[in-house]
Amino acid sequence: MSTRTDHYAVIGNPIAHSKSPDIHARFAAQTQQDLKYDRLLAPLDGFLASVQEFIRNDGKGLNVTVPFKLEAYAMASRLSERARAAGAVNTLKFENGEMLGDNTDGVGLVTDIVRNAGVAVAGKTVLLLGAGGAARGVILPLLHEKPARLVIANRTHSKALDLAERFAPQPTLEVSDFGALDDAFDIVINATAASLASEVPPISPRVFAKRTLAYDMMYGAAPTPFMQFAAEHGATVRDGLGMLVEQAAESFYVWRNVRPETAAVFKELRDKL
């Protein structure tokens, strides 16, 4: 009796650059799971139709990337707690006529910081730069780690305040604008898009110290401008490649109930950058 290979994909626009198929192919081989994983380019005005067609063709799950995470959130028939907190979905699972929406970005970030970088979040001071979708997706998993302080800083103070109020009451959660930051933090996370424009958020170098881990959600072959700035002021730096691999591993677990090992996949991707 032959078994059907389960079908997954990453959906977005653009999508050709996505490393997700490579990551999931390695996870599948490692865990001996019978699946295929493709890239799916959806028209900017055709996300819903693309997902429906994927389901009709017996697709089992999707990773969702830019610019469709909010549409996926609205479309899901059931949401995980972390997806609800994020207000966005990066993982869809189709099962028994239901569409489960999840968000694995935050747990990917936390796993990379705590397990891979070996830096505890518990009891630490954490600065989160940015108040957009990338920041919103990681706040709940960071709070679950019980930091001493989690400060959301943004160019527009009111936007940081609006974001913090979604998680209120949280006595450890604070807001700031970039210019008001004057203390050193244990962990500084760049969730802005500044690195895409080869810029650095306008923050004081005093947020960095020798003990600081400066983490940029972006990644590339060379350190980002944020990482360069942080390193010049004494911080240890790390980019977001590990977050990419760890959020993929969490999606794989949501779909298959099997947790893959990530270290070898991370090393392979790093070597190819």
UniProtKB/Swiss-Prot annotation:
Q: Provide the binding site for shikimate.
A: S18, K19, S20, T65, N90, D105, Y219
What top-level branch of life does the organism fall under? Answer: Bacteria
- Where do the catalytic residues lie? K69
Cross-referenced CDD domains: NAD_bind_Shikimate_DH (cd01065)
Any one of the GO CC terms: cytosol
The EC code for this enzyme is 1.1.1.25
One of the Pfam families matching this protein, by short name: Shikimate_dh_N
- What keywords were assigned to this record? Amino-acid biosynthesis, Aromatic amino acid biosynthesis, NADP, Oxidoreductase
Supply the InterPro entries for this chain: Aminoacid_DH-like_N_sf, NAD(P)-bd_dom_sf, SDH_C, Shikimate_DH, Shikimate_DH-bd_N, Shikimate_DH_fam, Shikm_DH/Glu-tRNA_Rdtase
Q: Which pathway or pathways does this protein act in?
A: Metabolic intermediate biosynthesis; chorismate biosynthesis; chorismate from D-erythrose 4-phosphate and phosphoenolpyruvate: step 4/7
Q: State the Gene Ontology terms under molecular function.
A: NADP binding; shikimate 3-dehydrogenase (NADP+) activity
Q: Where, in this chain's numbering, is NADP(+) bound?
A: E81, G130, A131, G132, G133, A134, N154, R155, T156, H157, S158, K159, M217, G240
Q: Name one GO biological process term.
A: amino acid biosynthetic process
Record-linked SUPFAM superfamilies: Aminoacid dehydrogenase-like, N-terminal domain, NAD(P)-binding Rossmann-fold domains
From the UniProt record, list the reaction(s) this protein catalyses: shikimate + NADP(+) = 3-dehydroshikimate + NADPH + H(+)
Q: What does this protein do?
A: Involved in the biosynthesis of the chorismate, which leads to the biosynthesis of aromatic amino acids. Catalyzes the reversible NADPH linked reduction of 3-dehydroshikimate (DHSA) to yield shikimate (SA).
Oligomer status and interactors:
Homodimer.
Q: What is the protein name for this chain?
A: Shikimate dehydrogenase (NADP(+))
What organism does the UniProt record list as the source? Janthinobacterium sp. (strain Marseille)
Name of the gene this protein is made from: aroE
